[in-house]
Amino acid sequence: MTAAPTDDVAVVLSHPGAADTLERLIASTQQLVAHFKVPATLYLTDDGTRPDAVQIARARGISVIPQAGHGYGGVLNAAVTGTTAAFIITLDADGVHPPELLPYFWAQRGAAAIVIGSRYIPQGHTQMPWWRRVCSRSLNGVFRTMLDLPFHDLSSSYRLYQRAALAPLAPVTAGDAALQEVLIKTFCQGHGVLEIPMHYVAVASGGRSFGTLLPLGLDYLAAFRKMWVLRNSVESSDYDTRAFYSRIPFQRYWQRRRYTILSGYIGDALRVLDAGCGSTQLLNRCPQIVGMDFGLRKVRFMRRPGRQLVNGSTFALPFKSEAFDIVLSSQVIEHLPDDPVIFSELIRCIVPGGALVLGTVDYGSWQWPLIEWMYGLAKPTGYAQEHITHYTTAILVERLTSLGLKIEQIEYICKGEIIIKARKLH
């Protein structure tokens, strides 16, 4: 078990270059981190191939940590298990990563869970053989576009990590594709990722060769397949946001039709709760909404200065009774057991005269079962298989009426989803 964090920052060097390059890098790094004015420890990972580098590091007072796996996956695993710092900075020790950038990483340590030295954002730059540049650009372009990611340099290994975000992912897959895996998993947990410009100059000797491209490509292909499943899973922090902006016309229409109906029901009400908000864009359309979700990753993703977000459960809403004019619960109850506590909790938080807005799919129609079957074929990692309670319009109307609510409006989306607005009379 890894000890609790003690050092503020661990600077982990890997892939050492020539002896004189390593000597200069260590000297520069030691001087630079001294200005951080916090406890800082330098480490060198040892994969067993460079005993001379280990000797240089120890002579300079650098701690050496064993690296069990190969590639950057092995480096990251060694960094997590072999250090105790709250922040971890990784950089290659062959001269391609300028240590002078370290203060810039440190200045952004609280801004994101991962800070990347990026070659492919404005003011970033790279100097490398043309074929490496083409391969690197293509790799990053495919991952960015196909996985719908907001960052540009997924293969840069010059990074700062917050241990709190990195440690739960360890051990990561060995190999260089671990860089993409860690980055995407962190983003899918709702953590922030920040890129800062870096100028990258490839070393004259060493590095990639044509002979390494095939095994590297196979590693990246395997990683891409895993990350494709994750990015299109409900486990991804931005699942609802991606659906709102989907490239699939029908999915985009459905999401935006729901958004229009719900925002119309809310109107100009100021005290509004969205119980089970996920990463809905309704929070941007109606910024007065208090968003609550059981999934912490969704709450993290939707954080904005001034926004009111709560990590909580629909079975025990963490709010006072009669705290809201409108309580909204959309696309939630079908994922939960049919428990009367859910309805009583939602109604408890509404003022007399306020309204409950409840949305779910309608299993009483023929349209939704057909849509669900087709959706399951097209997107097997989507929501459909998680619907454990099947409601119909008749069941919901009867349930809400029996609880003292008056049905005011009912809207449908393609006859497959029902959205009800019901008034709390007393």
Predicted regions and their residues:
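Short, acidic, metal-binding catalytic loop of nucleotide-sugar glycosyltransferases
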Residues: 28-38
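A conserved acidic beta->alpha catalytic loop
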Residues: 46-53, 95
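Acceptor/aglycone-binding surface of glycosyltransferases and processive sugar-polymer synthases
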Residues: 68-82, 87, 99-172, 176, ...
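Short beta-strand/loop segment that forms part of the nucleotide-sugar
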Residues: 37-48
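Conserved N-terminal segment of class I S-adenosyl-L-methionine
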Residues: 224-320, 326, 343, 358-359, ...
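A short glycine-rich, Lys/Arg-flanked "PGG" loop and its adjoining helix->strand segment in the class I
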Residues: 340-352
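Hydrophobic helical membrane-anchoring modules
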Residues: 1-7, 13, 18-20, 24-27, ...
